[in-house]
Amino acid sequence: MNIPFSPPHIDDAIIEEVVSALRSGWITTGPRTKLFEQKLAEYCGIQHVECVNSASAGMELALRWFGIGPDDEVIVPAYTYTATAEVVLHCGAKLVLVDVNDDLLIDVDKVRQAITPKTKVIIPVDIVGLPCDYQEILDLVNEPEIRKLFRPANDCQSTLGRILILADAAHSLGAYYQGKHTGAVADISVFSFHAVKNLTTAEGGAICLNLPETFHSESIKKDFNTLSLHGQTKDAFTKTKAGAWRYDVCTIGYKCNMTDVAAAMGLVELARYDQNILPKRKRIFDAYNQAFANDPRFRVPTYVTPTKQSSYHVFTLRVNHITEEQRDLIIVKMAENGVAANVHFIPLPMLTAYKSLGFNIQDYPNAYRQYACEISLPVYYDLSDEQVNEVIRVLKAAVSEVL
């Protein structure tokens, strides 16, 4: 039996909708993208969503919109994928890494210690689908002493009057925090629809706007739309209307719009997300939890609490009392027996690009401790009960062999 890690589910409904988009004669940003944005906004319980070609692009656009650049500081957890940090560096800002808790989420006490008058943005990461402690983070940035530290440099920053909370929600579509969907909690949240995500458009992302009422949400959406299309005031679909060919370029923008072909996939996936996709993933999580929770060799991830519900994106199992080398050997032995496993993620200070910036993993001990014993197990739509049982059997056998 060969069990991959996370292949996408592509069925006839998706193929038919994509073919329909292709046959329509409109394959770039158009009516399907607009409809997908509308449906996502309704799903999250917010007013406006702007779809883009990746979560990375969405996060960078958010930073650019907020005016982030040299002399600014942005706080990011050390335990995340490189995309979260790269967007900060692309803007020329100083990247400030902080450690995480045992649940892999950003340590708010470490965030507090890292805030300076130059801090403009905090990027919490809903790692593997579990929402961060947003109320604690929002309470922190709204503390009078923290607000006094904030030094606005433009109109957006002055209007907000505090540090921006930009959620890297790449993993957490469908998760809940205090009864609200992710996307409706932080000031701005960005989802990913990459091929391995719960909901995929092959490549894609979405910017969810949940800014205070002092901002005009519809106007901000237009700002993001303009930034995503070279700073142009009209997209290609709008220019097809009679007499509407003339446009302006009002700012120096980027090219990161979503296509209607991608949105076609997203519309099919979103329509069945809560009733079909999430329940299947939860069933797999529950099976793994039942198999490992009472075995002292393992520590299962938190995926439901009184205030949080995960999106069931990745099952991050920890194996107790092992070294990084033993963990790697377990993954090799699983592969030799037909089961693909992974690690989420290598902490940023362990990667060459970040070492060269002066980061040292010794400064982030908990990020390393969690990484060194973590194994991510297969979770995907078409994974059968038989295959889940095989993953469990193979992993337990590999651990017994290594230990």
Task: Set out the residue ranges of the language-model regions.
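Short beta-strand-to-turn element immediately C-terminal to the catalytic PLP-Schiff-base lysine
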Residues: 191-192, 205-214, 267
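Phosphate-binding glycine-rich loop
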Residues: 26-73, 87-91, 97, 146-149
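Structural detector of well-ordered beta-strand residues that form the stable sheet scaffold
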Residues: 50, 75, 96, 164-166, ...
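PLP-dependent aminotransferase-like
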Residues: 64, 68-169, 176
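PLP-dependent aminotransferase class I/II
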Residues: 34-38, 46-47, 121-125, 130-138, ...
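N-terminal "arm"/small-domain region of PLP-dependent enzymes with the aminotransferase-like
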Residues: 1-27, 31, 248-250, 378
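Conserved active-site segment immediately N-terminal to the catalytic lysine
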Residues: 156-200, 245-250, 299
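Hydrophobic/aromatic ligand-binding patch that stacks against planar heteroaromatic rings
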Residues: 86-88, 181, 261
